[in-house]
Amino acid sequence: MEQDLLKLDGRIVVVSGAAGGGIGTTVTSLVARAGATVIAVSRSEANLDRHVAPLASQGLLVTPVAADAQTEEGVAAVMKSVRGAKGELYGLVNVAGGAAPSTWCPTTRLSREDLRALFAQNLESMFFMSQAVAAELKAQGRPGSLVSISSISGVNSAPYHSGYGAAKAAMLSMVKTMALELALDGIRVNAVAPGPTATPASRTYVGDDPERDRRAIPMGRRGRPEEIAGAVLFLLSNLSSYITGQCLTVDGGINLKWSHLADDNTPLFLKDENFRAAMKR
């Protein structure tokens, strides 16, 4: 029965940022394997050929669309593909986003250009895609589910991530507002906030360091793209039919970890001899 609730047969789901070889590509694959027709969106035709075309060759119902979700023309191209696809429009997954290494800097050094680019890449694409899909669902009188990929940087503060974190936090605020506005239309709106995840982009920017991850993350490792995709499928599916306006954090417990913790997740002050002596008094 639970497996049936995860099925998306006959439904169309749009995935933006689908061709980076990480979370978006994995979401595209998993949602297609759940039976959906996926409109896979990316600005890069080369990446679509590399990461999305093989999914279609496996018999999955995946339609690649080269479009920029930040632009009016790009959103229009996506919706044209939706209207030409077989099935009923149902879902959207906003994965497009990210932060260029130049934006990982102290707040005092973040340029106007970088801040604007961060909001365009992470917030505007999410807003305009959600707006278009929600309007289409309302016009058709259909229920649906919209899921956006935020970040733990948008949930808690993160040094050197002021612009990126602000954009992802704004996304969460928008998710809540849209959830309220669309609830009576049967359209649910939620977000997933990944923690450190092993993707091609993360390897490029911060490399692989299992020992660092073991110290920093309570579960001792980075997340896998399929673990983020699983959370997305849950929020798309009927298993979450009474959930809206929420952010599901998938981070291996890193948000639970107080900054003054030792490697074994115990408070550093417990290792202080004077403190231990005071506890015995």
Residue ranges of predicted features:
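Active-site helix of classical SDR
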Residues: 16, 130, 167, 175
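Residue(s) in the substrate-gating loop at a strand-loop-helix junction
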Residues: 151
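Short C-terminal tail/terminal secondary-structure segment
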Residues: 2-4, 22, 233, 244-281
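Alpha-helical segment proximal to the catalytic Tyr-Lys
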Residues: 135, 180-184, 241
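Catalytic Tyr-X3-Lys loop
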Residues: 90, 108-127, 147, 171, ...
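Canonical Rossmann dinucleotide-binding motif of NAD(H)/NADP(H)-dependent dehydrogenases/reductases
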Residues: 6-39
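C-terminal helical subdomain
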Residues: 191, 211-243, 250-252, 277-281
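Conserved mid-core segment of classical short-chain dehydrogenase/reductases
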Residues: 76, 98-116, 160-163, 203-207, ...
